[in-house]
């Protein structure tokens, strides 16, 4: 056998990650059994689905997950008759870790609070490796359904694993844990039974446990979603939620209903109470599980649009054939009708829950950026989503909505004003809002990464145009400032054309500003051009050619501008001053100066002249 034993190193960073899993989650060691049983049940479901189109994959009549502790040998085995794994599958699935990246998992685990760490295991797809919390050696013997070959993967979690030929009478997988000296409790049948009932009671695949030489049932095995709501406790909902999401919190919202009539389906959906550590921004597809008459078919049916992908759970229907293929699913009108109905139900729930501002703020902070994607992607639901959006504002603390903003608009105000950037706190201090604040006009502050895009698809709310203040300087002429303006306005007749000539390659226009009160300069968007934040993103993406040129605005009442205007009227050279003003505008907007070295030199020279 030694001649055929293959030794392999784990994928990059796996050694460090294994150490993190073992030590950071030590106090939650029981979750290893949850993860291994869930993997086994999933393998059974996948073989059952495959058998619908390939009879050779048919499951045995007594298909179940078996848990067998052996105190004498100090081993714990979890066996399943599922789809199994080939040699290549073992190397790919167990020899490398976390498709989403070990570095991301490691960082999240290091940053998480102790009570948040267990949920990371399932979210990052590293559940199998939790076995090393209780075992100093793990052996996985597997035979893929449809193949006669079996292989054993083995590791002590020390940076390498081995692969060797094996024998297994039937397709499926055996995971054997050699239990550590300090983990004796996981050899006790009663302790194992308690864990299974806690974490896996709602898995529909039967689970049995070897106790006193006899197999006893470990789980109820009923489809929770098939039960009437009146028969399901909050504790049962929470347990099932934790099973499908790998979270340890309680759901923010639970939706459980039966649709009958033109469509016949049952749904049990959850909106999580916290944002997963594996950011939903990175996963673009909905993973709600589709079942047909209780049988799992796929979690890739797209039962919800991508902008509701944070919703998790199960939809079980009678209106599709059991042998439906994943390819056929995308073409069947039944699925489209179910998708429409489920989406409508979730939207109605969000609308209802939004009435509780404090509770809704919890949801919004976790999933608001994802919901905003629907404004860009989904014209059918655009207006409904708009009513659910929440923003920071210059007028109120906390979150506010478009509807609340409209209720506070000044009598002669026609538009809803927004400012888009990278940081809400920085936006609140931005020079862009000085003129609006001086006139008592509220501005909504948008700082999520998607905020640069979706306003292009939503041009109004409740009949009120939505305008970026970087494009709306002219609107201020209709409002008088509250209080006296500070300082005398400079005559910019000589200065403006000189600056425009000097900066002709960098700005579309140079003009006096209505919006500046305290700051000397700012950049705004050209009329008809993209918003400043969109220009910024285009430049970062190397697509500056599509960004257009900004407008440089000067505050004629600012001492610096007045001094430069005097020099221009006196016929002095203002070339250096022009470059410095433009760089100041870039820095004030949160961007670096175009040439940091030259900018620093000019500033140093100006300070030296004042010394």
From Swiss-Prot:
Start and end residues of each stretch annotated as C: 537-611
Gene3D superfamilies given in the database record: 3.30.230.80, 3.40.50.11260, Heat shock protein 90, C-terminal domain (1.20.120.790), Histidine kinase-like ATPase, C-terminal domain (3.30.565.10)
Family in the record: Belongs to the heat shock protein 90 family.
Subcellular compartments: Cytoplasm
Listed PANTHER family: HEAT SHOCK PROTEIN 90 FAMILY MEMBER
Oligomeric and partner information: Homodimer.
Region (B): 327-536
Entries under SMART domains matching the protein: HATPase_c (SM00387)
Source species of the chain: Methylobacterium sp. (strain 4-46)
Protein name per Swiss-Prot or TrEMBL: Chaperone protein HtpG
GO CC, alphabetical: cytoplasm
Region (A) location: 1-326
HAMAP family given in the database record: HSP90
GO molecular function, one term: ATP-dependent protein folding chaperone
